[in-house]
Each structure stands twice: as C-alpha cells, then as structure tokens.
From Swiss-Prot:
Ca(2+) 1 binds at residues 95, 206, 214, 216. Ca(2+) 2 binds at residues 177, 228-229, 231, 301. It is found in: Virion; Host endoplasmic reticulum lumen. Homotrimer; disulfide-linked. 2 Ca(2+) ions bound at each subunit interface in the trimer hold the trimer together. Interacts with the intermediate capsid protein VP6. Interacts with the outer capsid protein VP5*. This is Outer capsid glycoprotein VP7. Residues 253-255 are annotated as: GPR motif. The keyword Calcium applies. It comes from Rotavirus A (isolate RVA/Pig/Australia/CRW-8/1987/G3P9[7]) (RV-A). Some rotavirus strains are neuraminidase-sensitive and require sialic acid to attach to the cell surface. Some rotavirus strains are integrin-dependent. Some rotavirus strains depend on ganglioside for their entry into the host cell. Hsp70 also seems to be involved in the entry of some strains. Its main location: virion. Residues 1-50 form the signal peptide. The keyword Ligase does not apply.
Amino acid sequence: MYGIEYTTVLTFLISVILLNYILKSLTRIMDFIIYRFLFVIVILLPLLSAQNYGINLPITGSMDTPYINSTQGEVFLTSTLCLYYPTEAATEINDNSWKDTLSQLFLTKGWPTGSVYFKDYTDIASFSVDPQLYCDYNLVMMKYDATLQLDMSELADLILNEWLCNPMDITLYYYQQTDEANKWISMGSSCTIKVCPLNTQTLGIGCLTTDTNTFEEVATAEKLAITDVVDGVNHKLSVTTNTCTIRNCKKLGPRENVAVIQVGGSDILDITADPTTAPQTERMMRVNWKKWWQVFYTIVDYVNQIVQAMSKRSRSLNSAAFYYRV
C-alpha cells in the first residue's frame, strides 16, 4: 500500500520536473527567435524606406488677399485640377489645340501634363442641374451676367459648401427649417416652389392649406432654387414635382476643394445667406478681361496661389444622387 503511494508521489514529482524543463526549453527557444527577429529588423531598418501617410490639413485663406504672380517650386504630382468654363469660351478662342497649349503652360507652374482637365458647360442654368466636381481641385469660371446674378449666387452657394440632403414627401408631411444652415434645395428643368406657413393649429398663416393658389411663391420656373423660410415654423409646400426634385438639406461647412472665378462684373458675388454676417468671399475671385485667352492666361499665372486658398479633398459632388457629401 505504501509502495503504491510512494510510486504515485514519485511519478507526480517526475512529471512536474519534466514539465518545468519543457517550459524552460520553450522559453529559451522563443527568446532566441524573438531576439534573432529583432536583430534582423535592426540590421535591415536603415536599408528600408516606407511611405509616410499623414493627415491632409485644410488650408484656408481669403481670395481678397493680394497674391504675387510667381512660379513656385511646389509640384502637384499627385493632384488633379478641373477647369469648368462656359462653351462660349471655346467658341471665341476657336483653336482646336487651345487645351494642349494651356496644358503646356500649366506645366510651367508645376502641374504635369494630364493632371489638368477642361470641362465645358452650356450655361449657368444647365450647370446648376448637374454640377459634378470630381477633381482634387475644382475651379469654376462664371461669366458675370446682371440678369443671372441671383442664379450665379445660388450656384456658388451650392458648390462652395457641403450639403447633406434627405428626400421630402410634401404630399404627406409638413416641413420646417431648424436653423440658418437648414435649406430646401430644388433641382430640375423647371422648379416652381410655393409655401404656406402654418400656426400651431396647422392652419395657414395668410393662406389656405387646401388652395395652392393662396400659397406664397418663392421660386418660379428655376432650374436651381435654394429656399429659405422662417425657422421653427411648419410649412406646407407646393412643388412642380413632375419637373423638379426637392430635398431637405443641411449645410455642413465649406467645400474647400472648389473655388469660383467670376469673369467680369463690378462686384464679387456674395453668397452669404445671413444678412447680419460679413460677406463670404473666401475661395471666390474676379478676373476682369474681355477675351477668354487673357482669362485663362491669368488663371495659369495665379493657379498655385488660388490652390493655396483651397484644401484638397477626397469627397466629390454628384448631384445625380442628390447626396452632396459623398
């Protein structure tokens, strides 16, 4: 009986000793592997070069600041630049190779061939319906027209800011705007917008909810309409939905990879919605030349200074989805 107990104890002790030996052996092996691995890394580290990925901090500035006409050493090897211009520019220039000429001139400012894209649009109204800004930097040229001044302001407000939009079902619901950043944006071939403010009993204030003819008309046959009403008040809307789409939008902040270049006009467009604040002139500038060749030459000269007032963004603007922050 005692022999069996002694044997059991002895077996247990031997097992503990063997386990301890095995663990120590494994520890030595792991230490050897780890130290050898670290040694190899230390030896190879000076021979390796890794890509450093950093945060692209926004660069802001005012286009009213006087800029120096200069060629800078900074080369935008990984950036793309889009120039949006009215078709009348190409018609006036009347040169099949004018884009190649400008590409060579942009090369002297550090923009490689193939990094600058030229996109035309028919007029402000058609561009308003489907503005698609996909480049790292986007310069939109608008020729000033006194009869289209308000349309130009609305388009500038749309493309110079980021908007988060949601669908509106005006047949079922009343809507109200919560603050100054909340707007209703309508797009289409013809947008006529009428509103009827409601009191707490959902009765029309100065209008009849059952008669759209009594509604206040805030936009008539527009292709782009940004509607601003009294905040905190419910409204019933009437929209030409067969030719227009309306969305409830929130202005998130500036879209800093877009700049507007106004061609001609006595004053720079002011897109400030709140009349109590200073005019918003950032990323907006004016070029006063009669000929489009001179306009493009000026843009080439100052392109790097203009870009410095912008910030490269990965998000694009695609109005087809009507979701402006993509």
